[in-house]
Amino acid sequence: MPMYKAPVQEMKFLMSEVLDLDKYSNLPGFSDATSDLRDAILDEGAKFAEGVVAPLNRVADMQGCRYNGEDHSVKTPDGFKNAYDTMSQNGWMGLGFPAEHGGQGLPGVLSIAVSEMVSSACMAFGMYPGLTAGAAEALLSGGTEEQIKKYVPNMVSGQWGGTMNLTEPHCGTDLGMLKSKAVPNGDGSYSITGQKIWISSGEHDLAENCLLYTSPSPRDRSLSRMPSSA
């Protein structure tokens, strides 16, 4: 059976000797991220990736996601739900997110390291929390205060999932050809029209809700992100 061994010692070396994270202790989040705490997080992250996530790799290849045409639901491979719940309940989802939004407020480099372990152990599983983190970060970067309060805490907790909708039937990598658009309704809402395909994490049984992102801009070489509850 294929085995995954997280590069824990290499990560510890990089953080302590190359990045020298201790010298940033005056910055928000870094004061709590002592060498002992960093090592403990990396050790536990490795245990989770090696013991819980890695065994899912073969299961994911054998089963894949299963679609139920009667109720239009999607079931992820066996073990995915348990791994996702474990990840969210143990706080791995919110490791690098601000405490005021439900995260642990630790340096992003720790979150990236754990994310690398999870995705390396099983990329099929790692995309779910990975896309959720990406959508939450996009909201924190460009969302309104109302959107941040509504969506981010639920995503950081793992209750809601995130995805990104880019590919359309007529284009994939050439995003300048996208036709989907969002038109303001005048009341703060938007009417979104268009068709998306191949939406990773678009439907699953891991979270209660999916936060959908579309790309509604016309062909002006820019993209807009529209949060939507599915």
Regions found by a protein language model. Name each.
Residues 1-126, 150:
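Amphipathic, small/basic residue-rich leader segments at the start of a protein or domain
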Residues 92, 99-102, 144-145, 167-171, ...:
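Short, glycine-/Ser/Thr-/acidic-enriched flexible segments
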Residues 92-93, 97, 105-106, 110-114, ...:
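Extended, hydrophobic alpha-helical segments in both membrane/secreted and soluble proteins
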Residues 117-120, 138-141, 217:
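Active-site catalytic microenvironments for nucleophilic, acid-base chemistry
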Residues 131-132, 143-188, 195:
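Internal maturation/activation junctions in enzymes
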Residues 213-220:
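Conserved small/polar residues in nucleotide/adenosyl-binding loops
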Residues 224-230:
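Hydrophobic alpha-helical segments, chiefly the membrane-spanning helices
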